[in-house]
């Protein structure tokens, strides 16, 4: 199938007209600053807009600028981020904030190229900030823009391929509205998020690109964009130990690097243990189980791995230097990953 990249240029004017009437009302758009755009774009990575909004508003209330972000204790930062996942995003935000304060007078740099020198800011985020806040005509190419562009142009190349993405970026940069580059990027984002939906479910009847869209004209909306299949996730069974001693619950700090780095977790062991297995595992930790009670199961999906978890309450005696015994106040202050959300609720209820 022949690509029709000129369709992207033809889409620009009707797209902006559509956006002026149908653009989403979002808190980072109601008050626009480089800092707010930056934080929102980092939060929106791998996370739905509806889930981000309350986190964004809480974050802004406590950390309204780069100076506040640069100096907040990491434990508090991770607590504010708790539930959003991908915690390296929060750490990179703070690393970048420290550079912004020390090297840029507390204000984000004004060009796409200089923004990309900051920790955690890649091509997409830099382009979003530079176009929305500083008027730089550079396309912010994410999954939404790739999907719209693939369908409108009829390009059947794999959008996961780096060379193909580079090609898309060049054509989108050519199509961007020079007078309103930020609006163009936000319009394409909104079109992809609300109309040109993934998984063969676009709302073509209300799409401003319908008359110039190769996928619509040729019945290819279920096929485009072409995306290479991901590798199957590894499934890992874990037994989560909800341990209590003297009206306190056990938490353990994860390693400084890797998955969920430096966050608090419940002690756990690999495998799907029964009650006898739990007692043995506790003995190997230097603890003696007084009671062991199953609490149900939970599942959490990461990008490349899936945890199938089975939980147990256990009242224990003994000591283990890797464990921190938290009362209700300390437990509420600890940053605990969403993976343990179900178990955290059970522990919190028991600590009250």
What are these regions (language model features)?
Residues 1-25, 30, 193-352:
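Intrinsically disordered, low-complexity, charged terminal extensions of DNA damage-control enzymes
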Residues 3-9, 13-205, 209-222, 287-288:
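Catalytic cores of DNA base-excision repair glycosylases
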């Amino acid at each position: 199938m022949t690509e029709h990249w000129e369709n992207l240029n033809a889409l620009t004017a009707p797209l902006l007209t559509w956006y002026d009437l149908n653009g989403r009302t979002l808190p980072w758009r109601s008050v626009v600053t480089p800092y707010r755009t930056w934080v929102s774009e980092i939060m929106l990575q791998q996370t739905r807009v509806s889930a981000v909004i309350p986190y964004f508003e809480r974050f802004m209330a406590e950390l309204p600028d780069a100076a506040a972000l640069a100096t907040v204790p990491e434990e508090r930062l991770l607590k504010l981020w708790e539930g959003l996942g991908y915690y390296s995003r929060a750490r990179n935000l703070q690393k970048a904030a420290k550079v912004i304060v020390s090297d840029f007078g507390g204000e984000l740099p004004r060009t796409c190229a200089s923004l990309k020198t900051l920790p955690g800011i890649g091509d997409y985020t830099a382009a979003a900030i530079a176009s929305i806040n500083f008027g730089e005509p550079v396309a912010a190419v994410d999954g939404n823009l790739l999907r719209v562009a693939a369908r409108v142009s009829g390009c059947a190349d794999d959008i996961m391929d780096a060379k193909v993405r580079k090609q898309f970026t060049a054509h989108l940069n050519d199509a961007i509205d020079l007078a309103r580059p930020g609006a163009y990027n936000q319009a394409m984002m909104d079109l992809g998020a609300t109309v040109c939906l993934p998984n063969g479910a676009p709302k073509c009847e209300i799409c401003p690109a319908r008359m110039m869209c190769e996928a619509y004209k040729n019945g290819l909306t279920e096929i485009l964009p072409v995306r290479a299949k991901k590798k199957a996730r590894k499934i890992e069974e874990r037994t989560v130990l909800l341990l209590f001693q003297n009206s306190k619950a056990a938490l353990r700090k994860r390693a400084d690097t890797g998955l969920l780095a430096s966050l608090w977790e419940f002690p756990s062991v690999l495998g799907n243990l029964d009650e006898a297995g739990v007692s043995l595992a506790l003995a190997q930790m230097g603890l003696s189980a007084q009671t062991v009670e199953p609490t149900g199961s939970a599942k959490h999906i990461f990008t490349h791995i899936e945890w199938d978890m089975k939980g147990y309450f256990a009242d224990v005696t003994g000591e283990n230097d890797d464990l921190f015994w938290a009362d209700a106040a300390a437990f509420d202050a600890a940053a605990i990953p969403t993976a343990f959300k179900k178990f955290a609720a059970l522990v919190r209820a028991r600590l009250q």
